Each structure stands twice: as structure tokens, then as C-alpha cells.
């Protein structure tokens, strides 16, 4: 504007012609305003309203902006300020009044709040009138809005400093200049820091404390003192009263806002930014500026943060970081049409954020080398970037023009009702309001120009990131910066299938704030930022997305620092899919890797899916893992680590279909045999160190139950009996502290049980059950071989002989093991009354049915016709001599496959074997996925898909149908072979 024009009064200038939506309504609003001016005896305003130029302009504004209409009708003296003064001088006078209000002698906090609200409203309306009239261009409008916010913030800060000094909580060096050396640093961030505030902006603040300043007082109380002052500052500015509010305040850009005080000591802040600062925080700090309080200290901390924000060398590795921020700001690929109505002018495609980000990313990459690129304002930095050759002059001009155009639209949207919204109205009247305030009487014309602007911005923005690698994110925003939920991100997450989108945002922000050991390094957070869209997409496809992602969060929480997990997942999609499968389908496996993250290491071996975990395979790896370890506790801990990892890996093979349920049972059993045997060796060596050896000692472990039949599941206990023998003349061991043989082996067994089942930092090897020993819990935990044979021949119950059919020596002296095998076979071959045997088996099955009825149709073990019936058929047939194979098989399925034809015809045998395999595959998968027995309604969706795969059936309904058919067939066979049909 010219100097002469700048000295002219408001309505003496050329004003933008605005058209009301409804001329009659506009005239009525103007009449109401004139009546209010007469009531308050504002003759100058009444005269002004009688002039056509003023009346036309103001009536249009009163109709278009309900907020300005309400403010002028409530406080018509606002117009009195521009009756005889230029708008510039009128605004300057208001700002001077605001600045002085904080130091008025005797003013109370409530009086200050009233004064600030009234003066702010006056300034707000004047700025809006100047903007709508085009007396101010958009740049001047943002500048004056920033002046207003800075004046209000400064007044409140000065008032609070003087109040705290008067109360003795701080010691100001100069009460006439309370902000000088006060140590209370108030930084303006975002648009406030860049002097680019919009009409209804929040003001983003970060508050630091310079503890070295003399005003601070007690350094141990300063955080509490200044956090209280900061809380009062927020209240003064943003609490709504009868006079409205001054500015909404957002303090969530401070370091880790979920766990830090409102005012943070400078040292703690520097430590955070240097060690845990995130990419988006680097970008945010570009715009930081001291706006109130100790401005000198504020400039000093920004200077100290300069190396963090601005990398010293032109580092193209930083481009990966920039890409990761870009993904968070916009995860869509930009396809499809842009809808004008309902479009987000700030965050939408082609919006203000894309221009700001276009500038900031170039600054982050090049600003360390070129200080002239470190400015905090968007449009001036476009010019600097063009001067340095980082962008073309065409890009500079296009983006600068559209930036101010879009900011203009943003202001009009907000002027309607003074709300911080950036979304163009979708209804006809609302859209027309914005169009008319922009100077377009035809909304269609405005729509066309607005759409063209978006396309210009989108084209430039897309060109900037043409080479950015995509991670297949879902369409929509994915923004997890700061400490506030981005509305677009909430919508995206909901559309992806997340039920509690806000909770998911909070979880992901926790990752980015580095609160877990695995996310404390900047590199880890950068990789995680890159990976987040792919993670969210993968978990969303599990059909229970929230639950799966929370399990992954628990996994992250337990990971140690330094693990390169995120790089591994990024470079290995199969590993990512596997991890997602674990979290969605197998809560038990998820719990295991959460408690023992080291088990995840085994997945890095690409051969695990092709190598079958045989006994020889496991022995070879155990030998290498134990190495030269000789210390008792170290050996046991290594066994625990090895067992946990390989139980997990066997489970993963089952989960992925590399092995079936039968093979998994054999592998779990081989692993248990190996672990129990090595544990016994370690316990024996430790016992011998103190108590020596027993003359002629022989020890063996007898596996019972599912370990004996090589049918262990992921969570099975191990059933064991420890058998021993020694020379008849051995009275005690030969060590430093001798023990009688019986006591020696009891202690050996007790220590073995402790070694296997004691909870430690590395977990538990196995839960141990020794109740199948002679006389059960009443008998000694270690059994002499002669006592064992005598008991089995003379005193054992039928059910104990049934259990003996699965007894298998797994570790010990070879000759002793051979003797045990002979004893067992002799007992099993004893002549029996088959009818009585069948009656005993039936009675026991009925007792189980009474004491442990099946939970539902998915209780594969206890359901009539289920696993117990199959096991009882096999055990009955073994004891009755109806198994034809030699040597005698241990596994239930193998026994069933070798039933004598005269006992069970081939068709029945095939049905029993098929049923057992069907149950085994299902039960192995269920035990792998869940810690406890659970009904179908508790199966995670991913687990249902797993069960369909292991069963080879299309859906759960078909599995249930097949289960019922197998139950019917097996129960009929049980009744015929063991039931009354056997009589």
C-alpha cells in the first residue's frame, strides 16, 4: 500500500466488494448493530453506519460471519476505534494496552483475564475486517495475529512473574523488567514461532527453565514452581469465561509430553533431544522462537540445539529420515479425484501442510551446510531454496502463490464461527459463505480456482518424493507426531479395522518417544517410523487388529536395546508376516517372545523351515550352544535358553505348516528328552561333588505319559520316574558328605525336579509330574529297580499297567536301561483276564467322565469319542495282547495302526488312526496358541484360520462337523472293543 493510503482511515480506502448471502438478512443485522451503537451513544459509529460504503461492506460481513456479527453487536465500540484512526494505529494501540496490562499495579488475575479477553476480541475483529477488506494482505494478517498472541502471552507471563516474586517463590533481579534473567523460557512453536498464525490458531508453546539464572531460587523446587506458573499461564489464556477466551494453548510439543512436567529444565531437554529426539521434532524446532519470558536464555538453548536440528554436513542419509516423516504426514498414494467440499485445506492433498513440509524437508537436508536455509517462515524459505538451486523458480512462485491463497481460504473458514477448523463446509450455505468472503459471488468459480491450487501443490509435492520408497500403507493419513490424535489418522485406522483408534495412536507415539529400550536409539525409531504403515496394514488384516498390535507392543516393551529388529522386518517381509501371525493367532507364542525376546533370534536362520528338528539335529545345536560351560547354574541357564528357543521354533514350524502335529509331538518329545537328560547329568555331577558316588550306581529316567509315547505338546508337563540300582554292599556314598543310597537318590531326584521346574530369570525348563511312580505321591521320589519290578508285578492297579504301556527309558546307563525294558515287557506280557481288564478300563473311563466332564465339543481330550477313548483302546489292546507289531510301539497312533485284525477290522483301524491324527493336529495347534483350555469363542481369528489349515478344511463349521463324526466313530469303536461288546 502507498504511504498516503496507509494514513487513510479504514472506510476511505479501496475495500474488497463482498456480497451477502441474503441481502434482506444483512440489512436487518446492520440495523441491529446501529441500534446497539445508539444504545451505547457511539455517535461516530452511528454516522459511519449511515454511509453507503461502510453500510454495504459491514452488512455483508455481518451476514457472512456469525462470529464477527456477535462480537460487533456485543461490543460496537470496536468500530469506534477506526472512526477517527487508521486501522494500523488502532491495532497498535490495542497491542500496547495488552502489553501494559500484565504490569498494572494491583491488578488481579481475574481482572487480567477479563482485560485480555476484551482487548483480544477487539484486535481479532479489527484484523478480520482489515483482512476481508484486503487492507491487509494474508502475510500481514498472519503477522498481526502473531503480534496479538505474543502480546497476550507476554502480558500473562509478566503478571505471573511479578506475582511469584511477591510471594517469595522466585527472586526477580529487576521488577521493572520482570522477564529479564527470569529463567522462565517460553518458546513459540509452529505457526506462532514462524509468525504465521491463522485466525483461530491454538498457540503451541514449549516451556523450559534455565536453572542457572539467579531468579530461580531453590533449584530443587524450580520444576514444581514453574510448572505451576505454566499451568496458570494456560488458564489465563485459554479458560472460557463470559468474555470468551484469549488463545487455546497446546504444550504437547515438549519432549515426551506424556511423562514430563509442563516446564522442563534446559539440561534435561538437551539430553532428550540429543538422545531421543525424533525426526518430526527436528522439523518442529525449525520454527521455534522465544516469545515470552527469558528471551536471551531462549535464544541460547536454540543455539545449543542447532547441531541437533541442522546436520553439519550435507547428509543424503538424512533423506531416509525425511521419507519416514513424509510417510507419517501422508500415507496415501495420491490417486483419485479431490473433493473440494469437505476438503481439509491444511492436511488434505495439495494442502498447506504439503507446502510447509516441502520446505522443511529441504531445510533438514541442506540447512546444516547452508545457514541461510535455516529460516522459520515458509515463503521466504521458498525464495532462499530457489536462490541456492534446491528448487526451481517456477516451483518457488507456484508454491508461494498457492500458499497464501490457501492460508486465505483457511482464515475464511475460521472466521465463520471462530473455530480452529481447516475443512471446507460441505453444505451449500456454508460453502457459499467461504466463497463470498474470498470475494467470489459464484461458488462454482471459487471451487474451480481452489481445485486448481490444490493440483499445483500436489504436483510439486509429488515430484519432491518421486523416489521415496513405498511400504504399502493403506490409503489415508498416518500421523503420530506430537501428543495429539490426528483426526485423519483416526479415520484411517478405523477404516483399516482398528476399533480403538485413539488407543492405537497412543501406543505408536509411545514407540516414537523412545520409552522402550528397543526404541531409544534414533536409528531404531527412524526404521520403526518407516515400518509403521506396513505393520498397521499387516495387523489390520488379522481381523482382531487392536489385540494383535497390543501384543506386538508388549513384545517391543521386552526387547533389549541394540536389537536390529526393525531393519530385519523391513528387509524381510516373510519375517514380518510371521511375527504378525504369532501376534494374531498364537497368544501363547506371543507371550513367550514377550517374556523371552531372545527366542526370536532363532527365526533369523533361514534353514529352520526346511530342516526337521530331529534328535540328532537338536543334539548338534545343543553341543555348540553349551560350548565349554561347566558351572552348574550356567549349564542349567543355557539349557533353559536353548529349550525355550527350540520349543518356540518347533511351534513356529507347526504354525507355518512346515511340520504336522504328529511330527511336532515327536520334536517336542526329542527336545524334552535331551534337556531332561542333560539336566540329570549336571545335577549328578553337582551331587557327586559334595556327596561322591554310590558303589555300583546305575540311574535311568523313565518317561511316562505323552513324553513316553513321544506325543508331547507345546505346553505339556513331563511325566518321569527315576529308577536306580547299586551294589548290594553299598552302604553310603564315598564323598565328603556321604549319604545312604536311598537318601542319595531321593536328593538326586529332588534336585532334578528343582533344576527342571524352578522359575528363574531364564524361565522354567519343564514342569515335572512324578505321580506315576510306584505308590504315587505316597512313595519315595526315587525308586529302586527291584522295588519297581516287585510293585508292578504284585501291587500295581490296572490303570498303572495302562500307564506302563507308554513307559520308555530315555536316559541312563545302557545296560540298566536294557534291564528296565525287559522288566516292563515282562509286566506287560503277564497273563490277564481280558474281561476283567475291559471292565477296569470302562470303569476308569466312566470315573473320568464323572469327575472331568468335557467342557464343550472342542474338548478333544475328554469328549466321549475323543483322545482319551483312543488312548484307552490302545492301552487295553496292548495289555490284552492285541497288538501285532514287534518291538511293541509306544505312540498311540502306531499302536492303533497295528491292532490285530481279529480285534479290530481294517476299516475300523483306518477310522481310529484318521481320528487320532485329526485330533493330534488340532490339539497341537490349540496348545501351541493358547496357554489354557479355551472354547471356540475364545479362539483369536488368526487361530481359526490356522486350525482350518492344519485340518485341511475350509472353515470352522466343517471342522466341527468332522469332529462330531470322529467322536461318533471312536465312541462306537470304544464301546465295541472295550465296552460291553468286549465281554
Swiss-Prot record:
Pfam families tied to this protein: GlnD_UR_UTase, GlnE
Annotated Gene3D superfamilies: 1.20.120.1510, Beta Polymerase, domain 2, Nucleotidyltransferases domain 2
EC number: 2.7.7.89, 2.7.7.42
GO CC annotations, alphabetized: cytosol
Highest taxon of source: Bacteria
Reaction catalysed by this enzyme: [glutamine synthetase]-O(4)-(5'-adenylyl)-L-tyrosine + phosphate = [glutamine synthetase]-L-tyrosine + ADP; [glutamine synthetase]-L-tyrosine + ATP = [glutamine synthetase]-O(4)-(5'-adenylyl)-L-tyrosine + diphosphate
Co-factor requirement: Mg(2+)
Region named Adenylyl removase: 1-468
Swiss-Prot/TrEMBL GO biological process terms: regulation of glutamine family amino acid metabolic process
Adenylyl transferase: annotated segments: 473-983
The protein's role, per its UniProt record: Involved in the regulation of glutamine synthetase GlnA, a key enzyme in the process to assimilate ammonia. When cellular nitrogen levels are high, the C-terminal adenylyl transferase (AT) inactivates GlnA by covalent transfer of an adenylyl group from ATP to specific tyrosine residue of GlnA, thus reducing its activity. Conversely, when nitrogen levels are low, the N-terminal adenylyl removase (AR) activates GlnA by removing the adenylyl group by phosphorolysis, increasing its activity.
Family classification: Belongs to the GlnE family.
Name this protein carries in UniProt: Bifunctional glutamine synthetase adenylyltransferase/adenylyl-removing enzyme
Gene this protein is translated from: glnE
Amino acid at each position: 500500500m502507498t504511504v498516503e493510503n496507509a494514513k487513510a482511515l479504514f472506510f476511505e480506502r479501496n475495500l474488497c466488494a463482498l456480497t451477502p448471502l441474503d441481502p434482506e438478512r444483512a440489512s436487518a443485522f446492520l440495523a441491529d448493530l446501529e441500534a446497539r451503537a445508539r444504545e451505547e451513544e457511539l455517535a461516530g459509529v452511528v454516522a459511519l453506519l449511515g454511509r453507503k460504503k461502510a453500510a454495504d461492506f459491514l452488512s455483508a460481513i455481518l451476514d457472512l460471519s456469525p462470529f464477527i456479527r456477535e462480537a460487533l453487536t456485543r461490543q460496537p465500540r470496536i468500530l469506534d476505534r477506526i472512526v477517527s484512526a487508521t486501522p494500523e494505529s488502532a491495532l497498535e494501540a490495542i497491542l500496547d494496552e495488552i502489553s501494559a496490562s500484565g504490569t498494572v499495579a494491583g491488578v488481579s488475575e481475574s481482572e487480567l483475564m477479563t482485560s485480555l479477553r476484551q482487548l483480544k476480541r477487539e484486535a481479532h475483529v479489527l484484523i478480520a475486517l482489515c483482512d476481508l477488506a484486503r487492507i491487509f494482505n494474508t502475510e500481514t494478517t498472519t503477522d498481526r495475529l502473531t503480534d496479538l498472541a505474543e502480546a497476550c502471552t507476554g502480558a500473562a507471563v509478566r503478571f505471573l512473574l511479578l506475582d511469584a516474586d511477591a510471594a517469595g517463590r522466585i527472586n526477580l533481579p529487576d521488577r521493572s523488567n520482570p522477564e529479564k534473567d527470569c529463567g522462565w523460557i517460553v518458546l513459540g512453536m509452529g505457526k506462532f514461532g514462524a509468525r504465521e498464525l491463522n485466525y483461530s490458531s491454538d498457540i503451541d508453546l514449549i516451556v523450559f527453565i534455565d536453572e542457572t539464572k539467579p531468579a530461580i531460587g531453590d533449584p530443587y523446587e524450580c520444576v514444581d514452581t514453574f510448572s505451576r506458573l505454566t499451568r496458570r499461564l494456560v488458564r489465563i489464556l485459554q479458560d472460557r469465561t463470559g468474555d470468551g477466551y484469549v488463545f487455546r494453548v497446546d504444550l504437547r510439543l515438549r519432549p515426551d509430553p506424556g511423562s514430563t512436567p509442563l516446564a522442563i529444565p534446559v539440561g534435561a531437554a538437551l539430553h532428550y533431544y540429543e538422545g531421543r529426539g525424533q525426526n518430526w521434532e527436528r522439523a518442529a524446532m525449525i520454527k521455534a522462537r522465544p516469545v515470552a519470558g527469558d528471551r536471551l536464555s531462549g535464544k541460547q538453548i536454540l543455539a545449543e540445539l542447532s547441531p541437533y536440528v541442522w546436520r553439519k554436513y550435507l547428509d543424503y542419509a538424512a533423506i531416509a529420515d525425511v521419507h519416514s516423516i513424509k510417510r507419517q504426514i501422508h500415507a496415501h498414494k495420491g490417486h483419485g479425484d479431490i473433493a473440494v467440499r469437505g476438503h481439509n485445506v491444511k492436511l488434505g492433498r495439495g494442502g498447506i501442510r504439503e507446502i510447509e513440509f516441502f520446505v522443511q524437508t529441504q531445510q533438514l537436508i541442506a540447512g546444516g551446510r547452508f545457514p541461510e536455509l535455516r529460516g522459520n517462515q515458509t515463503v521466504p524459505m521458498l525464495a532462499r531454496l530457489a536462490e541456492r538451486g534446491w528448487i526451481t523458480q517456477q516451483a518457488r512462485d507456484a508454491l508461494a502463490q498457492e500458499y497464501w491463497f490457501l492460508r486465505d481460504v483457511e482464515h475464511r473458514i475460521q472466521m465463520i464461527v471462530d473455530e480452529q477448523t481447516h475443512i471446507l463446509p460441505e453444505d451449500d450455505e456454508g460453502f457459499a459463505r467461504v466463497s463470498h468472503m474470498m470475494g467470489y459471488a459464484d461458488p462454482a468459480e471459487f471451487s474451480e480456482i481452489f481445485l486448481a491450487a490444490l493440483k499445483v501443490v500436489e504436483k510439486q509435492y509429488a515430484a519432491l518424493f518421486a523416489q521415496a520408497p513405498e511400504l504399502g500403507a493403506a490409503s489415508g493419513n498416518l500421523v503420530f507426531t506430537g501428543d495429539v490424535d490426528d483426526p485423519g489418522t483416526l479415520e484411517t485406522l478405523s477404516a483399516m479395522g482398528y476399533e480403538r483408534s485413539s488407543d492405537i495412536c497412543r501406543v505408536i507415539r509411545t514407540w516414537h518417544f523412545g520409552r522402550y529400550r528397543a526404541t531409544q536409539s534414533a536409528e531404531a525409531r527412524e526404521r520403526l517410523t518407516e515400518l509403521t504403515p506396513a505393520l498397521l496394514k499387516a495387523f489390520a488384516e488379522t481381523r482382531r487388529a487392536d489385540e494383535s498390535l497390543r501384543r506386538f507392543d508388549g513384545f517391543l516393551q521386552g526387547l533389549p536395546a541394540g536389537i536390529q529388529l526393525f531393519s530385519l522386518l523391513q528387509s524381510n517381509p516373510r519375517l514380518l508376516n510371521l511375527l504378525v501371525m504369532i501376534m494374531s493367532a498364537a497368544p501363547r507364542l506371543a507371550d513367550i517372545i514377550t517374556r523371552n525376546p531372545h527366542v526370536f533370534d532363532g527365526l533369523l536362520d533361514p534353514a529352520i523351515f526346511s530342516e526337521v528338528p530331529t534328535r540328532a539335529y537338536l543334539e548338534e545345536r545343543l553341543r555348540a550352544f553349551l560350548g565349554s560351560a561347566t558351572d552348574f547354574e550356567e549349564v542349567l541357564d543355557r539349557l533353559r535358553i536353548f529349550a525355550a528357543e527350540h520349543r518356540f521354533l518347533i511351534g513356529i514350524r507347526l504354525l507355518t505348516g512346515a511340520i504336522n502335529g504328529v511330527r511336532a509331538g515327536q520334536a517336542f518329545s526329542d527336545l524334552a528328552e535331551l534337556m531332561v537328560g542333560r539336566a540329570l547329568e549336571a545335577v549328578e555331577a553337582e551331587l557327586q561333588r559334595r556327596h561322591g558316588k554310590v558303589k555300583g550306581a546305575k540311574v535311568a529316567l523313565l518317561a511316562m505319559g505323552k513324553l513316553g509315547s513321544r506325543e508331547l505338546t507345546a505346553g505339556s508337563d513331563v511325566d518321569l520316574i527315576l529308577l536306580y540300582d547299586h551294589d548290594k554292599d553299598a552302604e553310603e556314598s564315598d564323598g565328603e558328605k556321604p549319604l545312604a543310597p536311598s537318601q542319595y537318590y531321593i536328593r538326586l531326584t529332588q534336585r532334578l525336579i528343582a533344576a527342571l521346574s524352578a522359575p528363574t530369570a531364564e524361565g522354567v525348563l519343564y514342569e515335572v509330574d512324578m505321580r506315576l511312580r510306584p505308590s504315587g505321591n505316597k512313595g519315595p521320589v526315587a525308586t529302586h529297580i527291584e522295588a519297581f519290578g516287585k510293585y508292578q508285578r504284585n501291587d500295581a492297579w490296572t490303570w498303572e499297567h495302562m500307564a506302563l504301556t507308554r513307559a520308555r527309558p530315555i536316559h541312563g546307563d545302557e545296560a540298566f536301561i536294557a534291564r528296565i525294558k525287559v522288566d516292563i515287557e515282562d509286566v506287560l506280557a503277564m497273563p490277564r483276564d481280558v474281561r476283567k481288564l475291559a471292565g477296569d478300563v470302562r470303569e476308569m473311563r466312566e470315573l473320568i467322565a464323572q469327575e472331568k466332564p468335557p467342557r464343550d465339543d472342542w474338548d478333544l481330550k475328554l469328549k466321549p469319542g475323543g483322545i482319551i477313548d483312543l488312548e484307552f483302546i490302545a492301552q487295553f489292546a496292548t495289555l490284552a495282547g492285541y497288538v501285532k507289531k514287534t518291538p511293541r510301539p509306544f505312540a498311540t497312533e502306531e499302536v492303533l495302526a497295528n491292532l490285530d485284525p481279529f480285534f479290530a477290522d481294517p476299516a475300523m483301524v483306518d477310522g481310529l488312526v484318521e481320528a487320532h491324527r485329526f485330533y493330534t493336529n488340532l490339539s497341537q495347534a490349540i496348545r501351541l496358541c493358547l496357554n489354557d483350555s479355551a472354547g471356540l469363542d475364545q479362539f483369536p481369528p488368526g487361530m481359526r484360520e490356522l486350525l482350518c489349515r492344519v485340518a485341511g478344511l475350509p472353515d470352522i463349521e466343517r471342522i466341527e462337523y468332522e469332529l462330531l463324526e470322529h467322536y461318533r466313530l471312536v465312541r462306537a469303536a470304544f464301546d465295541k472293543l472295550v465296552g460291553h461288546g468286549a465281554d
